[in-house]
Amino acid sequence: MAPLTVDPTALDSAGNQVVTAGEGLGSVISTLSAALAGCAGMAGDDPAGASLGHSYDSSAAKLVEAMVATRNGLCGLGIGVRMSARNYSVAELQSNVGAGGGALPAPALPGPISAGRPPSAVGSSDSAPPGWGWVAPYLGMIWPTGDSAKLRVAATAWSAAGTQFGIGEIVGTGTPMGAIRAQQIPEGPAIDRAFADAYRSTTGVVQQCQQIAAQLTSYAAKIEKVHAAILDLLSRICDPLTGFKEV
């Protein structure tokens, strides 16, 4: 068995850095939520839009839950490391009776955050243009009621959140991981496994954020293409302002 070699102060500092990294992930979630707040109903309520919207709603809610769980887990890991540091400092103080200094204080516990459900993507965001009633019966299609601008805003928000979440976890835990691994303590392997779990969770979050962003961007492009084609057709047969059929 390897001898116990630990610097409680260094271990406590590393744990505090991990907590800070976790809290940073919370800020990423808050920024994402604020951006998505203005994107309600972005997919529309036509059949295609509603189908995509319901799928998005489910995926987005689960992904935010995963992000929150990763944030809370990382903060909890950091507090666990800090508690270990305190325990070692107490043991060190007790084994050196008469030595100066004192034990490290118990760390303050960061409160867990909860997952707020993103606003639904289903809803009417764009009404049909003047003159649509003239051509709709002949085209056999429905005017897409989604809002491509909102879809692109949401896509950008998800993409940015994924990138920032990944960078925040990797950069924020790199240095403290090195400091923790420098300590020869029994719980070292368990802490390593916890960091590996956090990394896997973060990687999954990043990938899913990019997938959602790509899905929203693709649907925005489809809406814009259909809208442009319909508006072009209407401009040929109707007054674009009144929608009255030209004869």
Q: How would you label these PLM feature ranges?
A:
Residues E246:
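Flexible nucleotide-interacting loop at or near the entrance of a catalytic core
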Residues M1-G243:
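N-terminal secretion-targeting helices of virulence/extracellular proteins
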